[in-house]
């Protein structure tokens, strides 16, 4: 399992590198090599590490370990075919951790990034209303049961495409350089992670790699079913390329516009699930 954890981390970082490369090529720039995020992780691992004088030492260090821990747990939950509710609970916990990152440093940039993380959560989390549609069809929120259902009834992406779109938007909101990346806006330098440097930033890179891998793996298992491992990796690459196109071709929204757009999408999803429920009964 340790080997798979390492693989998930490095492949997730490779996916983020592909993401940056595709965005650069769309914008007619050469861009960094696709292994750039992996190099970043190693680079920060050997740089000087410190805790700012204005920071809360315990919180400043603890949030990095918590961030890695919760996404490691999420990976094992997915591999074990556990409940989607646990994955979504970890996602919500990650928003709290992001807020902790911002508060821990004492930096105004970090604080604003942490506040924006809470603002974004208000609109992202309701998108999980899409799980209601999944439960209507599969009668379960267990990933293993959802995979079993698709073996006999076909991929859920064909049965409930709007739920897949809602989950896709959740993933878009966690991708760097995307329209909903308000927690990392240029006016905030690096947002909530501005003051985390050295080994702490390397820990954040590990967290980002795991998070990317887990979210894409969950999306594929829930909407495409239990595909072979090689096919799953190929699908991850294809999905990350589509995400890169979305991020490259759409402007970063303001916090207000980001919440407004995602709230409207949530409203559409509520109506969609209500229609499915009425039709199903």
Predicted regions: what they are:
Residues 1-281:
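Alpha-helical transmembrane segments of multi-pass membrane proteins predominantly involved
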């Amino acid at each position: 399992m340790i080997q798979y954890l390492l693989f998930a981390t490095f492949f997730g970082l490779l996916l983020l590198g592909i993401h940056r490369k595709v965005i650069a090529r769309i914008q007619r720039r050469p861009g960094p090599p696709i292994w750039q995020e992996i190099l970043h992780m190693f680079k920060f691992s050997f740089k000087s590490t410190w805790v700012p004088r204005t920071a809360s030492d315990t919180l400043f260090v603890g949030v990095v370990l918590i961030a890695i821990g919760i996404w490691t747990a999420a990976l094992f939950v997915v591999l074990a075919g556990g409940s989607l509710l646990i994955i979504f609970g970890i996602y919500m916990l990650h928003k709290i951790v992001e807020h902790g990152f911002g508060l821990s440093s004492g930096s105004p940039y970090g604080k604003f990034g942490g506040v924006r993380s809470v603002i974004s959560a208000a609109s992202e989390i309701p998108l999980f209303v899409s799980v209601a549609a999944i439960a209507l069809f599969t009668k379960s929120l267990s990933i293993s049961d959802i995979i079993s259902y698709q073996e006999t009834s076909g991929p859920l992406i064909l049965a409930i495409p709007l739920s897949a779109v809602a989950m896709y938007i959740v993933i878009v909101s966690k991708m760097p350089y995307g329209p909903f990346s308000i927690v990392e806006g240029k006016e905030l330098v690096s947002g909530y992670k501005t003051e985390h440097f050295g080994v702490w930033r390397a820990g954040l890179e590990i967290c980002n790699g795991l998070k990317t891998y887990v979210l894409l793996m969950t999306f594929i298992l829930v909407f495409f079913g239990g595909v072979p491992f090689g096919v799953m990796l190929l699908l991850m690459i294809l999905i990350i390329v589509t995400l890169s196109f979305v991020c490259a071709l759409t402007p970063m929204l303001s916090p207000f516009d980001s919440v407004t757009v995602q709230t409207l999408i949530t409203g559409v999803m509520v109506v969609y699930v209500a229609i499915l429920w009425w039709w199903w009964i």
